[in-house]
From Swiss-Prot:
InterPro entries xref list: Synaptobrevin-like, V_SNARE_CC, VAMP4
Localization terms from the record: Golgi apparatus, trans-Golgi network membrane
Name assigned to this protein: Vesicle-associated membrane protein 4
Subunit structure: Identified in a complex containing STX6, STX12, VAMP4 and VTI1A. Interacts with BAIAP3; this interaction is increased in the presence of calcium.
Membrane topology category: Single-pass type IV membrane protein
Function: Involved in the pathway that functions to remove an inhibitor (probably synaptotagmin-4) of calcium-triggered exocytosis during the maturation of secretory granules. May be a marker for this sorting pathway that is critical for remodeling the secretory response of granule.
Residue span(s) of domain v-SNARE coiled-coil homology: 52-112
Modified residues (Phosphoserine): S17, S30
Gene symbol of the encoding locus: Vamp4
Length: 141
């Protein structure tokens, strides 16, 4: 046998029900066993709470969407930062290679200049020596 409940309900207990249900269920003389099923969540208590819950759930869903967008943006930003870091490392390596190559080229050009100056000096010395030999041979004879 189910537990016994009060037979007469307050208006607050039945405000969410349809009038015909109330009339049929509460006015008919029923067994005590049937009264067991009359109790349940009432309309006005759940109505505003349900709306508040839906409102809060909508806000939670919006926050979740915003957080997912933010996480996606952070991941994309991280990928872009990785690409930027790779490019900067490549640029740094290229700058170092350019600096080393320019120093090497500068040395090569300096040695080339030294060789040209040495050849010019040797040519001038040979020419001067030939002139001196010609003058000496001319005066001796």
């Amino acid at each position: 046998m189910p537990p016994k409940f009060k037979r007469h309900l307050n208006d607050d207990d039945v405000t969410g029900s349809v009038k015909s249900e109330r009339r049929n269920l509460l006015e008919d003389d029923s067994d005590e066993e049937e009264d067991f099923f009359l109790r349940g969540p009432s309309g006005p208590r759940f109505g505003p709470r349900n709306d508040k819950i839906k409102h809060v759930q909508n806000q939670v869903d919006e926050v979740i969407d915003v957080m997912q967008e933010n996480i996606t943006k952070v991941i994309e930003r991280g990928e872009r930062l990785d690409e930027l870091q790779d490019k900067s490392e490549s640029l740094s390596d290229n700058a170092t290679a350019f600096s080393n190559r320019s120093k090497q080229l500068r040395r090569q050009m300096w040695w080339r200049g030294c060789k040209i100056k040495a050849i010019m000096a040797l040519a001038a010395a040979i020419l001067l020596l030939m002139i001196i030999i010609l003058i000496v041979v001319k005066f001796r004879t």
